[in-house]
Amino acid sequence: MTEEEDREAAADMNLFLQRRAIEQVKKSVSRTYILRDDNATDSGRVIGYYAISVGHLVPDDIPKVVSPRMTIPVFLLLRLAIDKDFQGKGYGAKLFVHVLHGLVRLAEETGIYALVLDPLNDHVRLFYEKFGLRSLPGDAARMFIRVRDVEAWISQTRH
């Protein structure tokens, strides 16, 4: 990333938290979870955050063996961002594991087939591939992982 791209990413992260996250929570469109640095002198600097919601996939997006005719409920990861000063220190993985645990809890209560997200770029795509996400059949730009695969990953890694 260039210095200019760094500044733009930081500004986007801050703008989302200051404006859009609050609006979306008030409208019950999504929820945003924040990870703070409790050791910071400025009363808990934001390390990173993620925003989630729920949605559905239409039959064209998923294999016919899953559902030949009906829509499938999914958990959407709308955003996951880490402050540039904290990148490369494992915080992205920590937040994503938190997302995965939330997915499993929600699936137990409501019935969710998968987590779906739209990676920002190839670097981000590689990050999610490490957790077992793959391209969504019918929409290669999106990625997904089934709940049962998340449950297996959690039990194998004991996260």
For each of these PLM feature ranges, what is it?
Residues M1-K89, A93-V116, L120-H159:
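Non-catalytic substrate-recognition and accessory regions of acyl/acetyltransferase enzymes
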